[in-house]
């Protein structure tokens, strides 16, 4: 039986209890407050649910990750980075990026970025833990991505493109920025050829949790993000003891 999480206590089951089918489904219930979200990501868990469903929490195995220094830029993409007239910014238009991710997906296949999810991640952005990368051309927002940053880990949430390769440009700039300022890992969630072509690879969930234990508390440059992650005091179970998705439509897939 799937565990139901009461909203008044921020705590998760150990990720080892996640279902194999559907892969990674761990629990239902809880809340989308900043404390819940910080606790979830810290333990390798993320929310994904369709409109009308309860909050569902996931921790798939294996996990797709990208080490920033391993970003792979093909010759054609390198040419677009140089010559396509893109300007890239960080945290200049977070709400516009998350709105674009939601509306672009909704037009194509439906979206998991409900108004409640939108509001939850915007609150995290205001508190300094959610960030966006924007890609502009001729003053218009043509691509981008957003996610959660805890210490040296960036947990990618969603990306979009309105012109060819704009989300790839955002990811390349994110990886280079993280590599230059102490970032250690980008969580891309589940395997796709699109992200694998950029250097992402699958690792076991146990290895992913080990990396979180190391990198979430790793020191990073103060110039990495404008605000440091807030403390949360959550409790969570992991294979190291207390405290120690398959998402359809996330960093693993590009909206166009």
Swiss-Prot record:
Region of interest: Disordered: 232-256
Keyword match Transferase: yes
Reaction(s) catalysed (UniProt annotation): N-terminal L-lysyl-[protein] + L-leucyl-tRNA(Leu) = N-terminal L-leucyl-L-lysyl-[protein] + tRNA(Leu) + H(+); N-terminal L-arginyl-[protein] + L-leucyl-tRNA(Leu) = N-terminal L-leucyl-L-arginyl-[protein] + tRNA(Leu) + H(+); L-phenylalanyl-tRNA(Phe) + an N-terminal L-alpha-aminoacyl-[protein] = an N-terminal L-phenylalanyl-L-alpha-aminoacyl-[protein] + tRNA(Phe)
GO molecular function: leucyl-tRNA--protein transferase activity
GO cellular component annotations of the record: cytoplasm
EC number of the protein: 2.3.2.6
Annotated keywords: Acyltransferase, Cytoplasm, Transferase
Localization terms from the record: Cytoplasm
Protein name, UniProt field: Leucyl/phenylalanyl-tRNA--protein transferase
